[in-house]
Design a protein with these regions (language model features):
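Membrane-anchoring alpha-helices and their flanking helix-loop junctions
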Residues: 1-137, 158-192, 196-212
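Active-site-proximal inter-transmembrane loops
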Residues: 132-155
Length: 212
């Protein structure tokens, strides 16, 4: 049983390491959409076209607060539930729940697969592009031949595994908000990539699915 909590803690530790040391730029981040929004057009050689990206950038701050900042905050807070519970069980012997036994193996496998997929896809894109700062490239090989968004797909798989192991209504509501929020921001990112890479990205979309 302790293996469930150990795997969960390692998964969150790897997320922290990834965020600090393996930064991958995104125009759909909270920082870019809500704070540094004026710089997004500088990545393009032409003015922003009408679409979900321009529409979202032009939202008033109140709407961004309601539909971007607050959902992101809720996702982060509720998303930490498995980590907090795992630490409490392993280090303080406090049992708030018991993972569903029938889902233990499946949940652990999904967590490991999800993190592995995200980490190796991140290393792949950074190795090919040697990304520093906010640079962008159209990656179509390796993990990106399987999915247009392998980093996010890996996070979805990981959290699905945790949902099988950690029963909590607030956590589940947070996951729904997280999936919805990230999917919308993914549409924003795709609009940007379509404008940045043009026909090349259109062909990539035709040959590779958004997730799987």
């Amino acid at each position: 049983m302790n293996l469930v909590y150990i795997i969960t803690i390692i998964a969150f530790f790897s997320i922290g390491f990834e965020l600090v040391f393996l930064h991958v730029p995104s125009v759909a981040s909270v920082y870019q959409l809500c704070i540094k929004r004026a710089s997004i057009s500088t990545y393009l050689s032409k003015p922003l076209e009408k679409g979900i990206l321009q529409h979202t950038i032009n939202w008033p701050f109140g709407k961004k607060l309601l539909f971007i900042i607050i959902p992101t905050g809720i996702s982060i807070i509720t998303g930490l539930f498995p980590l907090i519970c795992s630490i409490s069980v392993l280090f303080y012997n406090r049992y708030y729940f018991e993972p569903l036994p029938v889902f233990n193996a499946i949940g652990c496998i999904l967590i490991i697969l999800g993190r592995t997929f995200t980490i190796f896809a991140t290393l792949d894109i950074r190795k090919k592009n040697n990304q520093e700062g906010d640079s962008f490239m159209l990656k179509q090989q390796g993990f990106f031949k399987i999915s247009r968004n392998p980093l996010l797909l890996g996070m979805y798989v990981m959290y699905t595994g945790m949902a099988l192991l950690f029963f909590n209504y607030a956590f589940y509501i947070g996951l729904i908000i997280y999936f919805s929020n990230m999917h919308y921001r993914l549409l924003v990112e795709e609009d940007f990539l379509q404008q940045l890479f043009g026909e090349a990205y259109k062909q990539y979309k035709a040959s590779t699915n958004r997730y799987l």
